[in-house]
């Protein structure tokens, strides 16, 4: 079984995802208890914001092995980056293979070095200035949608991202996708959920991959992970 958790208060204009911690933590506690009691063997895909914190909270509430509790942010963030690159180059989105790691928020880490269009690195297709602009827009894409909607937050792309992950689990597709996973030393981070490349199959996260990151990329990823780790301690008491 796969349970996709979307329950929670949506962002309003001017809010960060982290502004939702208190309200949505209570909802995740209730939903997690129900999953634990009625679907004890399920793989859980969390969509609720703030994503990485609520995924960690869900794992603690259910007591499930961490490989069976996953956050969907990386697939969503990568899809947004692919869309912006396709707009810039006038190419098909299907030809864009992006990679976005880190938390689902302002600290996310787009990786241009690992992003290609038709197998060609985007560093060879556009200027550094445009790459940086697209990376920044990727990080703020959710807020852009919230502002335009005025009430509520994004739903089409998150729904599509969750469906991609669920299909990989249900059919044991073993797709390599970026998702919020529980780290136990990978990338120098421990006891935190953060977006990293992983293999998704019938057991949930089958494997986490450690990319060869530059010093700056690794520092950005660790900064993102430590931000959420501090939030877990200071706000949720973990």
PLM regions: where:
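N-terminal Rossmann-like NAD(P) cofactor-binding module of classical short-chain dehydrogenase/reductase
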Residues: 1-4
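Rossmann-like NAD(P)(H) cofactor-binding subdomain of soluble oxidoreductases
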Residues: 16-83
């Amino acid at each position: 079984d796969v349970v996709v958790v979307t329950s929670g208060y949506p962002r309003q204009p001017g809010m960060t995802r982290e502004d939702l911690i208190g309200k949505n933590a209570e909802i995740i506690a209730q939903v997690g208890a129900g999953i634990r009691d009625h679907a004890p063997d399920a793989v859980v895909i969390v969509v609720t914001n703030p994503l990485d914190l609520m995924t960690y909270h869900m794992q603690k509430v259910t007591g499930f092995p961490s490989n069976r509790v996953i956050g969907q942010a990386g697939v969503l963030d990568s899809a947004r980056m692919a869309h912006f690159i396709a707009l810039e180059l006038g190419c098909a989105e299907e030809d864009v293979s992006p990679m976005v790691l880190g938390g689902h928020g302002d600290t996310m880490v787009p990786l241009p070095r690992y992003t290609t269009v038709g197998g060609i690195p985007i560093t060879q297709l556009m200027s550094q200035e445009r790459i940086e602009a697209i990376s920044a827009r990727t990080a703020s894409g959710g807020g852009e949608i919230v502002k335009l909607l005025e009430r509520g937050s994004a739903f089409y792309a998150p729904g599509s991202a969750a469906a991609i992950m669920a299909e990989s689990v249900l059919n044991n597709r073993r797709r390599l996708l970026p998702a919020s996973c529980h780290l136990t030393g990978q990338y120098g981070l421990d006891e935190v959920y953060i977006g990293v490349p992983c293999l998704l199959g019938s057991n949930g996260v089958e494997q986490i991959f450690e990319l060869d990151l530059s010093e700056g990329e690794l520092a950005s990823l660790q900064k993102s992970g430590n931000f959420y780790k501090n939030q877990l301690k200071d706000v949720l008491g973990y």
